[in-house]
Amino acid sequence: MALGSTAALAHDSHNEHAKVKPEIPTSLQYNFEYRMAKEKARDAFRHPKQTLKFFGVKPTDTVVEIWPGGGWYTQILAPALEGNGQYVAAHWPKDSSVGFFTKYRAKFDVKFTDHPERYGDISVTSFEPPKNTTLAPSESADVVLTFRNVHNWMSKNYEQTVFDSAFKALKPGGVLGVVEHRAKPGTKRLAMIESGYVTEDYVKQLAQNAGFEFAGASEINANPKDIKNYPAGVWTLPPTLRLKEQNKAKYLNIGESDRMTLKFVKPSK
């Protein structure tokens, strides 16, 4: 009887142990194994850990990144969300009429979606207004992020559409995080498009028009060395260095652009 009781106790203990689920971390856990040295070097200007902390990204979140390009942030976010959350890349369509878009979308797929063993189950949607305006299913995202894209949307005159799409994709209480090259206050629209620098006031207005509430700003990605007046706009600075060897040392010394880091919230119902 005692032996049977001991066996039963051991069996119950085993069942209880089997029911215990792995503890979900309360903050993002980073795996930089697959990042190249040149990508890590940009952390000094892009501050990914601090930026994502400011936006409040959690490991259980569904996070949509608009136009991730070559996937600099994908390498950081996708592994950190794997298993508990979901990374969604709202990328350029494979059939876009813009050659640059199709080229880099193909590169993204080869690097990321073809390697779930590294980056997990990445979800990719096609986003290119005015044809493709759905970032993700309505009210499915906890966080929508965009890094240095607003000036691109302005050049096509669909920046408001993008902010509206972000609002629709987010759950009530969800966060929109925007990082963008920061123009001097009062800069005119055409100058913003030509230079790549956008005013904070204009970004705030776009968000407000979409229905967002402003939730805070951070100077994490500020660069006081950036004078914002260059022959080839913001692309004069690294990492683009559009002027190539011309005054290269000067521009490398300035570093990457001065950037706003703004947080907006979709009001709860």
Please report, for each region that a protein language model flagged, where it lies by residue:
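A short acidic, Gly/Pro-enriched loop at the edge of an enzyme's catalytic core
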Residues: 133-144
